[in-house]
């Protein structure tokens, strides 16, 4: 199987939406590890029952990898795929043994039936067409190979909605499940799990979203990772910011200010036999 040996670029990625998301995540790369508490929590859950072997495709690997603490041998090869070149450049300096591929989950730059298992932790919610991503995973995955996926689903970030902030729209569990063609896939386990992370203050809570390349909107202005050096108090005006902080304090719990995500987890097998 021919694979890129360093950081490579998928020439098919030209859509402005993909480029915009990639730019946001590249800008967030250096600060990603400071804000990825949800990713760590979800990854720990997703890795339970995941058997790493052969050629592993990590979709949306970011600047790190959930396989960092696993023994790497000749029988295990990790291909770290991300749309953000900045993320992969940082990953390559820390994990030089991994193959870094800059590419899009909807147009995977791998040959048919070349991957033994697929892992993706909180990345596929950014797909413009999730059904295209499931079709691509079915194409590159060997018969009997499994895909373990966690995806941010509808109902996430309810606390932000309660504060009057608009957030990215996410697909429901039912819509996500419908994107898997039952002629290609066998469902082994599907579940929706709430995951709550806590923060010392509202600024830290909002930066946790900005720091991983996502965005929220107020009625005044979009808050994105391109403004990562700006103080949130300046974005709405000092008075509005103080009022927003006061409203947020109404939701404080003993652990801090909560932010709850609805995480859809899929364990699916490629139809066509066992490996």
Curated annotation (Swiss-Prot):
Which keywords does this Swiss-Prot/TrEMBL entry list?
Answer: Biotin biosynthesis, Methyltransferase, S-adenosyl-L-methionine, Transferase
Q: Where are the transmembrane segments?
A: none
Tell me the superkingdom of the source: Bacteria
Does the UniProt entry include the keyword Transferase?
yes
EC numbers for this chain:
2.1.1.197
The reactions it catalyses are: malonyl-[ACP] + S-adenosyl-L-methionine = malonyl-[ACP] methyl ester + S-adenosyl-L-homocysteine
Q: What class of enzyme is it?
A: transferase
Key word S-adenosyl-L-methionine present: yes
GO BP terms: namely: biotin biosynthetic process; methylation; ubiquinone biosynthetic process
Metabolic or biological pathway, per its Swiss-Prot or TrEMBL entry:
Cofactor biosynthesis; biotin biosynthesis
Q: Which CDD domains match?
A: AdoMet_MTases (cd02440)
The entry lists its GO molecular-function terms as:
2-methoxy-6-polyprenyl-1,4-benzoquinol methyltransferase activity; carboxyl-O-methyltransferase activity; malonyl-CoA methyltransferase activity; S-adenosylmethionine-dependent methyltransferase activity
- Family according to the record: Belongs to the methyltransferase superfamily.
- Tell me the function of this protein: Converts the free carboxyl group of a malonyl-thioester to its methyl ester by transfer of a methyl group from S-adenosyl-L-methionine (SAM). It allows to synthesize pimeloyl-ACP via the fatty acid synthetic pathway.
Protein name as catalogued = Malonyl-[acyl-carrier protein] O-methyltransferase
What species does this protein belong to?
Shewanella oneidensis (strain ATCC 700550 / JCM 31522 / CIP 106686 / LMG 19005 / NCIMB 14063 / MR-1)
The organism's taxonomic lineage, starting at the top: Bacteria, Pseudomonadati, Pseudomonadota, Gammaproteobacteria, Alteromonadales
Gene name for this UniProt entry: bioC
């Amino acid at each position: 199987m021919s694979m890129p040996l360093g950081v490579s670029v998928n020439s098919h990625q030209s859509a402005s939406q993909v480029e915009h998301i990639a730019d946001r995540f590249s800008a967030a790369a250096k600060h990603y590890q400071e804000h990825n508490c949800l990713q760590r929590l979800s990854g720990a859950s997703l890795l339970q029952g995941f058997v790493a072997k052969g050629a592993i495709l990590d979709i949306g690997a970011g600047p790190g990898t959930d396989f960092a603490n696993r023994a790497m041998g000749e029988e295990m090869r990790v291909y770290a795929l991300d749309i953000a070149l900045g993320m992969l450049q940082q990953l390559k300096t820390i994990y030089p043994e991994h193959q870094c591929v800059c590419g899009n989950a909807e147009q995977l730059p791998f040959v048919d039936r070349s991957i033994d298992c697929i892992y993706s932790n909180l990345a596929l919610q950014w797909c413009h067409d999730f059904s295209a991503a499931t079709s691509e995973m079915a194409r590159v995955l060997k018969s009997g190979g499994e895909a373990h996926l966690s995806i941010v689903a509808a109902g996430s970030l309810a606390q932000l909605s309660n504060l009057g902030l608009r957030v990215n729209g996410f697909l429901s569990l039912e819509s996500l499940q419908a994107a898997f063609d039952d002629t290609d896939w066998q469902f082994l386990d599907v579940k929706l799990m709430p995951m709550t992370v806590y923060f010392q203050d509202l600024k830290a809570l909002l930066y946790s979203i900005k720091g991983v390349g996502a965005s929220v909107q107020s009625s005044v202005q979009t808050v994105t990772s391109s403004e990562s050096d700006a103080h949130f108090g300046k974005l709405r005006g000092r008075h509005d910011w103080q009022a927003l902080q006061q409203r947020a304090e109404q939701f404080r719990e003993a652990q801090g200010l909560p932010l709850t995500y609805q995480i859809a987890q899929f364990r699916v097998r490629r139809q066509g036999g066992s490996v």
